[in-house]
Amino acid sequence: MGIYIFSWPVLREALLKKKDEPGCDFGKHVIPYCHVNGQRLFAYEYNGYWKDVGTLGSYWEANMELIDIIPDFNLYEEIWKIYTNTGCIPPQYISENSVIEKSIICNGTEIYGEVHNSVIGSNVVIGQGAVVRDSIIMQDVVIGENCVIDKSIIAEHVKVGDNVTLGIRS
């Protein structure tokens, strides 16, 4: 596991040569191929936060960790704050009947329903009566009225119609 930086010609060659390798993996196939073929390789030991998010499960877990009371990767850490550039969009709008619990809500989002233990991207609309739990909702998503979204990852630019149920309640 790690972070890899390649020049495009070297990476392209290695991927083409190893494309038929079952379960082709950087650490098991691509890096050894580059080493055997005389490519210059360098390593840097990094002791800060790092998490492999190469699967949907690990991506979901990493996002859920962001909303822990004291996350391993703290978006608000003094020496390493994370900034975003969302352009000129309004702040969040939370209707008076909304319920939000232990979640990250980005700018431009309008919430008319409930959000629990979730990460909500920018410019998202969550309709009246909708309930979002344990989910990641990417930017520019519309979730219709009376929907239930449980333990799901919703890609950007998706519109979920009214009265839809997605995911599995744990």
List each language-model region with its residue ranges.
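Conserved nucleotide-sugar donor-binding
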Residues: 3-13
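Left-handed beta-helix
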Residues: 9, 17-170
